[in-house]
From Swiss-Prot:
Keywords: Nodulation, Repeat. One of its GO terms (biological process) is nodulation. This is Early nodulin-75. It comes from Pisum sativum (Garden pea). The keyword Repeat applies. Residues 17-67 have a biased composition (Basic and acidic residues). Belongs to the nodulin 75 family.
């Protein structure tokens, strides 16, 4: 009696149910939705923004540079002041005494 049951009732019922579902209901629904959206709604809007940004970005930098350059001419009064003139002299006199020691200047003297 134990020889006619195990080899007969164990194989057929376990091999039929998992074979008709996974390979049939999975591939079709997963391959359709992603095929009609990405290749259609992505390339279109992504190619337009970079085209409309170029023209407006080239105009603003063209009207400003030529306008902000002339104002720097107002710097003369800054050089006439005594503070900026006195500060430049002491900074330039410090390196002279180090020059005779070496022909390189302040570089080798700083290490000494």
């Amino acid at each position: 009696p134990p020889h006619e049951k195990p080899p007969h009732e164990n194989t057929p019922p376990e091999y039929q149910p998992p074979h008709e579902k996974p390979p049939h209901e999975h591939p079709p629904p997963e391959y359709q939705p992603p095929h009609e959206k990405p290749p259609h709604e992505k390339p279109s809007p992504k190619y337009q923004p970079p085209h409309e940004h170029s023209p407006p970005e080239y105009q603003p930098p063209h009207e400003k540079p030529p306008h902000e350059n002339p104002p720097p001419v107002y710097k003369p009064p800054y050089e006439n002041s005594p503070p900026p003139h006195v500060y430049h002299r002491p900074l330039f006199q410090a390196p002279p005494p180090v020059k005779p020691s070496r022909p390189f200047g302040p570089f080798p003297a700083f290490k000494n």
